[in-house]
């Protein structure tokens, strides 16, 4: 996805550095996230998009929106709050705007779709 950062450092969960910081390759983190999501039944394309967003968000230091959320997403998937089989639908498509019904898909799926649509529209309007 963003492809700018190769690795990031993860602080211990107690928040105290103490010189003990782990360095994880972004590719390994993406693979882990994708595998977890696929084991829950998410199709490869969507699992890859979600893994890319979560991992690279961590790499840029925005941990509040990164991989720390994966366990919560898994809980919501298992509880039925997130539909891993949902196919977001474009319900309004005009020259310079579009509206997507995410249909309870995990947020990164319609977000990536919306970004692609916005880029296409920007190139044609």
Please give the residue ranges for each predicted region.
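Short, Lys/Arg-enriched N-terminal segments with co-localized hydrophobic residues
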Residues: 6-20
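Active-site cofactor/substrate anionic-group-binding motifs, chiefly glycine-
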Residues: 66-119
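N-terminal and secondary-structure boundary signal
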Residues: 38-41, 56-63
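Generic N-terminal amphipathic, Lys/Arg-enriched alpha-helix
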Residues: 21-40
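Short, surface-exposed connector motifs at secondary-structure boundaries
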Residues: 123-125
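Flexible, glycine/charged-enriched surface loops at secondary-structure junctions
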Residues: 42-49, 64-66
């Amino acid at each position: 996805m963003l492809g700018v950062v190769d690795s990031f450092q993860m602080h211990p969960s107690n928040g105290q550095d103490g010189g003990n910081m782990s360095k994880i390759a972004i590719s390994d983190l993406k693979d882990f996230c994708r595998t977890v999501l696929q084991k829950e039944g998410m199709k490869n394309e969507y699992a890859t998009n979600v893994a890319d967003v979560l991992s690279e968000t961590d790499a840029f230091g925005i941990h509040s929106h990164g991989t720390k959320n994966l366990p919560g997403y898994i809980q919501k998937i298992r509880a039925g709050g997130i539909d891993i089989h949902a196919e977001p639908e474009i319900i309004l498509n005009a020259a310079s705007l579009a509206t997507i019904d995410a249909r309870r898909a995990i947020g990164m799926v319609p977000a990536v779709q919306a970004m692609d649509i916005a880029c296409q529209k920007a190139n044609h309007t």
